[in-house]
């Protein structure tokens, strides 16, 4: 009986370790996206009318669009900025 408990606990530990690894593995891929969205999404429509800061925002926005075009290339953004990146290509 003790042997069964030990085996069960080992299996649990292995499954838990795999789930934890998978979580952090996926987080590693998605974290840059969420950071990018958090930093730049609220100022996507800022443009050069804001001077240097606006120009820098456009540059960062373009970087985000290149990295995550499916999220950042919305019709609203295209209308507001007259440019968008689709699969890394400027339209």
UniProtKB/Swiss-Prot annotation:
Residues passing through the membrane, by range: 12-34
Membrane-topology annotation of the record: Single-pass membrane protein
Main location, first listed in the record: membrane
Keyword Membrane: yes
Organism: Saccharomyces cerevisiae (strain ATCC 204508 / S288c) (Baker's yeast)
Name of the featured protein: Putative uncharacterized protein YDR250C
Keyword annotations of the record: Membrane, Transmembrane, Transmembrane helix
Location of this chain's protein in the cell: Membrane
Domain of life from the UniProt record: Eukaryota
Keyword Membrane on entry: yes
GO-annotated cellular components: membrane
């Amino acid at each position: 009986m003790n042997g069964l408990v030990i085996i069960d606990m080992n299996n649990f530990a292995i499954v838990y370790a795999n789930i934890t690894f998978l979580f952090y593995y996926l987080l590693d891929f998605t974290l840059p996206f969420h950071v990018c969205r958090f930093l730049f999404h609220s100022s996507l429509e800022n443009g050069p009318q804001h001077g240097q800061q606006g120009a820098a925002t456009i540059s960062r926005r373009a970087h985000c669009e290149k990295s995550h075009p499916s999220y950042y290339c919305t019709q609203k953004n295209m209308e507001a900025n007259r440019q968008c990146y689709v699969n890394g290509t400027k339209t």
